[in-house]
Amino acid sequence: MKVADFSKNASPAGVPVRGFMLDVSRGRVPTMDAFAELIDLLARLCYNQLQLYIEHTYAFENHGEVWQDASPLTAEELRALDKLCRERDIEFVPNLNSFGHVERWLKHEKYKPLAECPDGFYHAIFKMQRVAGTFAACEETADFMSRLYDEFLPNFSSKKFNIGGDEPWELGQGRSRELCEKCGKRNVYLEHMARLKKRVEKHGKKMMFWGDVLLGESGEIPAEFLKNTIPVIWGYDSGHPFDAQCSRVRAALEKAGGNGEFYLAPGTSSWLSFGTRQTNALKNIREACSAAKKYGASGVLLTTWGDFGYHNPFCANLIPLVVASAEMQGAKVPETAKEFAGIFEELGIFDEAEAFAEALLNFGKLDDCISKKITNRSITREMFFAKGEAFESVMSGVPADEIAAAQDGISEIEKILLRVPAAARNALSFKELMLAVKMAHAALRRAEAFLKNDASARAAVEAEMAGTLKTEFAAVWRLSNREGGLAESLSWF
């Protein structure tokens, strides 16, 4: 199978905008060479939009304390990436979270007056006290973001701008408590998003935003707010109610004027994982693309994130990227190692890629060996990083025979990787996959030692995790990423 087959066999009912969003704020900021390779990969796979998720990893003037340890992108670099994307017919859409997920700003004393809860808040989902992470919903913070927009947006030729706006966890717990009690949290949220929208439109751009708050309450979606915006309906688990949410958004857009745009955003399921949640990813992608075509979405934005240390290798995105491209275009979706190998060879990832493709497919299904699931993350990854009572909680209810089955799976993957030609073993994707397999294997050996109450074996594997695996992780990181964020990622080991 070749990539050309996607467009050649594409359905006329395919999705017009085929986008990919890469998180560059949770640790990993790729080198410019790695960005260039990504853009080339996306172009070859028929993607036509790229977004880089940014919270603090842009070198804003006068805000050096926020990004000084992050190896941030510069204006010159963003302009170079914009040019590179235009040359490959890819729209480079600016993405800067502007309401929630701003912990890396608000942890500094200088910015705490902008916070909804300057001293932190109680997170109902994580059931713990968290540091401030959401701007207050007021003119002051909208003006602050406007000044950042003035500096950030001239680097992009796109007429769209994704301001994020997802998960403002503590909204209504601090400065806006009385207003939310009086007017309702969603109304306070929409009022502030309208403030930001005015600042976006000043730059001649259309505001994109995550739709979770909009869809979080039942009832009719305020149609007027959606005018000249692009809501993005995101959901990363198979079985996400895309149909119901698309129906609500489509109805609101028709009420607002009929020709409104909206996107759907599935995920690669690579985050909080070593690459072992592929089964969930492919179902999620298929369901999102199906709903996008059914309800006339203008785009699908495949996302990948780096929550809690960004330990997921980029190679874990390869199969989801290929499958999503085919699904978006309504083309035949590759399924076998041989089919993926043909595509990987064409993309220049490997010359002889069948063994690599087989190993990547098998590794992606590793978590299927264990019946216990943890929402939005890999249980194998949790077996590696969880400590103390958290590790005991992860292991609760996990039977020894399932750990053994997963270890058998790892052993088979290791045998397959031995078939990868020697000339291909210097490829970054091979090194990433080898490391991911080693880390998953260590996690399973740690789990086995716990179940056997073998303190000596557990101590040995934990020493390996904190020693050779940590060292190898840093070495592989540096092959394609900047130094910023690495120390934070290593602190999890």
Q: Which residues are covered by each model-predicted region?
A:
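Feature activates predominantly on carbohydrate-active enzymes
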Residues: M1-C183, V188-E191, R195-H203, M208, ...
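Substrate-binding groove of N-acetylhexosamine-processing glycoside hydrolases
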Residues: V3, K8, A80-K83, D89, ...
